[in-house]
Amino acid sequence: MTKRERLKNRIREELAQHPKIDRGTLMGWLAQGEYRRVLEELFFFTESPEFVHLCQGIMQDIEMSFPSMRESGQECCLGFLAEFSIWLQSYLPNWHLLNGDKDALSSVSERQLTALAARAALLIAKLAQDATGHVGSLTARWRKDIASRLAAESVPNPQQAAAALVGEDIGSYLTNMTASLRSSNARGIADLHAKGATPTEISNDYAAFLDYAMLLGASFVTCNPPLVDIAWVADPERWNPVVDRIVQEDPGASSEALATKVTLEIVLANMRLLRPVFLLTEGCTGYVSLQVNPRNHDNSSAMVSEAITIYSDLEKKLGGGVPNVVFKLPATHAGLVACRDLTGQGIGVNITVGFGMFQHVEFAQALQEGEAIVSTITNMSGRLAFPVRDELLGIVGRLAKSGIGEVELREAAAWSGVAVVKRLHQLMARRGYDLGRVKPLVASLRVYEGGAYEGLPTPVPDISEVIGVGVITIFPNVRRAFDALPPMKLRPHAVESPVPKNVLDVLRHSEVFKQAFYVGDPELLPEEDDQLRPDHPLCLDDEADVLEWTPVRNTIAEFCKSYDAFETRIEDRRQLAGRVVA
């Protein structure tokens, strides 16, 4: 039995050992304020034939016992019913209740879900008549939470927008939230995935607000030092006490050690949210991507040691379960050595700081040979497009003599990451790689708006033109822009469509793009256009040159700077705690 098979067996065993929870226990959890735990039990671990009856019974119990409940219990039950109604109309039932692999008799129908949501809404309206104080408390909390999320989505005046979304009562909140979920283009991609029409999964490119992203169908999370820090800033009431506890438990620890522990806590919180999806899919999805210390980008042994230590810690925190985590490694020679070591042990990785085919081809082969259940190869599309754009703008006068204006070059640059992703997908399919296990992942998405980009198919080609790839990880503001577009006719296999020839005619003037796009292997790509050959093709063995290549250099520098800032924030918190104690 291979390592991968043993890992999958452990996941199956954990799911099989999940205890069956009765109605009384679920009501007890509600009384204790644990309504998310109740929701997860119902939606992910209750067998479909029992689901409707159990939900009806819980609503009946709430209605009968509500008048005699404590005030905290009443508020919790109203909150539960509201979230229950939203979950019913979200993507979440697709993971288990609407599972297309089941026959009609063992699945819940959309009609049944709609009926349950309607019943929950009626019950809320009835109970809320004599609980106006609880309604006010809940809507105030929702406005605060949603305002934080909308701020991350770069919405102007997020407090005002949150107030409009929540409305004056729970009924308005349910109506508006449901409409928002149903109109989401990102949700549309997830729905295609649920139907088996596209392999593309959507991911939350953020270490916060995963609960909302999961309503839209997110099944993956990508984290790096800036994103972990952002999660802390987004919810200081939650994470300040956690950081303080970590500092107090080990006051003499180095800043680096404390940064690792804080990262671990934020990652673990996201892992727990995705854990049911991970179990239900036998480890095929439901992962959190955790970046090792970016300062070790050229030290394979340090990266491996850090990953193994964290993996072991997470295993313990999960009670011996297989951690639903993949480790971000840089697409460098040292990263390749670390990749082979970790995946040989069955530990999944996400190859990051990736921009070019000379990186992707090597790592795809290594991951195919590895033992991990799932690994990903990230193409950082926007972080490639901007250096390409800047390079072309630097020669705009020369290009003008060839009839290429600024609008054409800006538009072409926006295609550069898309072009690399399409080529990567093409070559991996041509080689017969297992694309369910070795997944191309598109990250660093950009929104292109204004007159220079009117010729693009959409303002977000990094999404619309690569559907059909393994994973698309979406930053909140990009998802907001994508969802703000009119309902789209999504193409399930858009990644297979070629890049327009006129775009490549412009991009051949960029050395940065040619370095990224060029394969240089006649066996892999005999039809390759020699006009797209860079002056000095890179390979991973040229580690010093790779680290100096503009997109790699810029990204590693930013990650290291962000990691330093993260450590500084922790040090500031340590100093503050010391002053408070003194």
Per-range role (PLM):
Residues 56-241, 334:
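N-terminal capping/small domains of soluble enzymes
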Residues 224, 290, 327, 342, ...:
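Conserved, mostly hydrophobic/aromatic
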Residues 263-275, 304-311, 339, 360, ...:
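Generic structural signal for well-ordered alpha-helices
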Residues 316-325, 340-349, 433-438:
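Short, surface-exposed connector motifs at secondary-structure boundaries
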Residues 336, 348-500:
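Catalytic alpha/beta core domains of metabolic enzymes, predominantly
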